[in-house]
């Protein structure tokens, strides 16, 4: 899984778990079809929709040169009903 960096756990992503939607940060060079293939192959699920967006970059200055630090984008992946990704699904107590 060289395209997916890690799962994201924010307030919004935790709320989306109830709608069977999972959030991942992926490398910016990866295409949507590659990510869909990797998720379906690795987690053994069926993907029905994918939404992606680039996060605002954070500026990083090294003396006179201004650069940026974020080289990834965020994908919200919707699974078919009946499928889930077990390590990311938690019961509330």
UniProtKB/Swiss-Prot annotation:
It comes from the Eukaryota. Keywords: Chloroplast, Plastid, Ribonucleoprotein, Ribosomal protein, RNA-binding, rRNA-binding. Signal peptide: none annotated. SUPFAM superfamilies: Ribosomal proteins S24e, L23 and L15e. GO terms for biological process: translation. The keyword Plastid applies. PANTHER family: 60S RIBOSOMAL PROTEIN L23A (PTHR11620). Binds to 23S rRNA. This is Large ribosomal subunit protein uL23cz/uL23cy. Disulfide bonds: none annotated. Belongs to the universal ribosomal protein uL23 family. Part of the 50S ribosomal subunit. It holds the Pfam family Ribosomal_L23. HAMAP family: Ribosomal_uL23_B (MF_01369_B). GO terms for molecular function: mRNA binding; rRNA binding; structural constituent of ribosome. Its main location: plastid. It is found in: Plastid, Chloroplast. Coiled coil: none annotated. GO terms for cellular component: chloroplast; ribonucleoprotein complex; ribosome.
